[in-house]
């Protein structure tokens, strides 16, 4: 697994940790399978998850990175009452993790042969 990646010219790390690690306690005080720390530029992932679930979790956490790197988090804070900020952020990350593949697969179907040029460019633009 790649342990470093760049988004918006910032280097981020992915670190696997034991399932009871202090790094897996989230902002709401819950123990979870992964967290993202924008100050450390780090995603912490439980070493016990794998396969499709790991992929979903990584997409979710990388979406947090995108929200912070492109200052989308500031828009969430501007548009949401304080008590809804974290739930809205989580919902956005879940939407991409749960439905992102379907969106891009559908775009490929709609664009046909043109998708090979359009969809990868748009994906790169979103995370570069």
Name each model-derived stretch.
Residues 1-53, 72-128:
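Metalloprotease/metallohydrolase-associated module, dominated by Zn2+-dependent proteases
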Residues 56-68:
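Active-site recognition of the HExxH zinc-binding catalytic motif
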């Amino acid at each position: 697994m790649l342990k470093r990646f760049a988004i918006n010219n910032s280097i981020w790390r992915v670190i696997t940790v034991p399932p009871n690690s202090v790094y897996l306690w989230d902002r709401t005080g819950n123990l979870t399978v992964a967290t993202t720390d924008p100050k450390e530029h780090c995603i912490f992932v439980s070493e016990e998850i794998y396969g499709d679930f790991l992929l979903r979790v990584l997409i979710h956490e990388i979406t947090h990175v995108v929200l912070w790197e492109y200052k989308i988090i500031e828009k969430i804070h501007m548009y949401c009452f304080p008590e809804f900020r974290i739930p809205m952020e989580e919902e956005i990350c879940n939407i991409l993790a749960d439905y992102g593949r379907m969106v891009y697969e559908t775009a490929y179907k709609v664009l046909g042969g043109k998708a090979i040029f359009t969809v990868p460019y748009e994906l790169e633009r979103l995370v570069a």
